[in-house]
Amino acid sequence: MGLKADCWIRQKAVEDGMIEPFCEDQIGKGVVSYGLSSYGYDIRVSDEFKIFTNVNAEVVDPKHFDERNVVDFKGDVCIVPPNSFALARTVEYFRIPRNVLAICVGKSTYARCGIIVNVTPFEPEFEGHITIEISNTTPLPAKIYANEGIAQVLFFEGDEDCEVSYKDKRGKYQHQRGITLPKIL
């Protein structure tokens, strides 16, 4: 399984629509960088957020998630409260090839500010926006800049196609648009 370079990522994005919209250059002046890099693609966070709140004093339960646990926010800058958590989504829509697994890692710019980004792997033949988990580990409010970089995606091509892809097993987050809350089937 090999890590894929910029030329492969560009070809798959342009010819097969693997990443839409696709930014062929790495944009970094005055913003948290995003776009194509040497061995990855820096994704952007959209201007849609769901910020966790304890107004209703509910327990967070992944099997029975209560939408009252989050507050919707739309804007150019999202303030994540101290020691709190938010969900967001990518600007980009992904179509992952059958023989590819993508791993996402947080950007150093945010990590150095105590902002931890988590995204689960993009499985073979996954299609959709990516829901991003953002943790503010600091005792201070933290800014997240919409339409700027938030994490980097690394693409790994398998030596052979998998027997069962995310699409084949009808993954519960397949074709997700917007921010998707936890689901149990």
Swiss-Prot record:
Listed pathway(s): Pyrimidine metabolism; dUMP biosynthesis; dUMP from dCTP (dUTP route): step 1/2
Presence of the UniProt keyword Membrane in the record: no
Catalytic residues in the record: E133
This protein's UniProt keywords: Hydrolase, Nucleotide metabolism, Nucleotide-binding
Annotated GO biological process: dUMP biosynthetic process; dUTP biosynthetic process; nucleobase-containing small molecule interconversion
GO molecular function terms noted in the UniProt entry: dCTP deaminase activity; nucleotide binding
Reaction equation(s) it catalyzes: dCTP + H2O + H(+) = dUTP + NH4(+)
UniProt: dCTP binding residues: K107, S108, T109, Y110, A111, R112, Q152, Y166, Q176
EC identifiers of the protein: 3.5.4.13
InterPro entries: dCTP_deaminase (IPR011962), dUTPase-like_sf (IPR036157), dUTPase_trimeric (IPR033704)
Role, per record: Catalyzes the deamination of dCTP to dUTP.
Subunit structure: Homotrimer.
Family per similarity comment: Belongs to the dCTP deaminase family.
Protein name: dCTP deaminase
Record lineage: Bacteria, Pseudomonadati, Campylobacterota, Epsilonproteobacteria, Nautiliales
